[in-house]
Amino acid sequence: MMNVLLISTYEMGRQSFGLASPTAWLRETGAVVTCVDVTRQEFPEAFAATADLVAWYLPMHTATRLAVPFIQKVKALNSQAHLCCYGLYATLNTDYLTGLGVKTVLGGEFESDLVSLVAHLNDKKDASLPHTPGTQLSRLDFRVP
């Protein structure tokens, strides 16, 4: 069973489709998913320290910049976690994010790629391996969160 932490840095308390939708997809695979909006909730250090996959939703430039200290924090807490960033600004900042230690960067319709990443990590059992599926543009079916 994969423990997944999804983080939003810029929702400011609004419902985040960028967390809710992938949560529904990932829970269908049996993953244990915890979501956090760090603008309204305390960062879950205990879960981050044991998560297999930690992923940041980056829908805009500000969210990307705000994610940086949390990426560094997770690297310090859990060097074994696979770090991922997804969303419109993730792929625009691929070089910057991978320079910070992010292993997977997803753009476009990211839900199915997150599911593929979890399957890849379950199969490989090596969270340090990069996973680079590219940008998914196909139309995806909506999952009810």
Question: What kind of feature is each model-predicted range?
Answer:
Residues 1-145:
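Acidic, low-complexity intrinsically disordered segments
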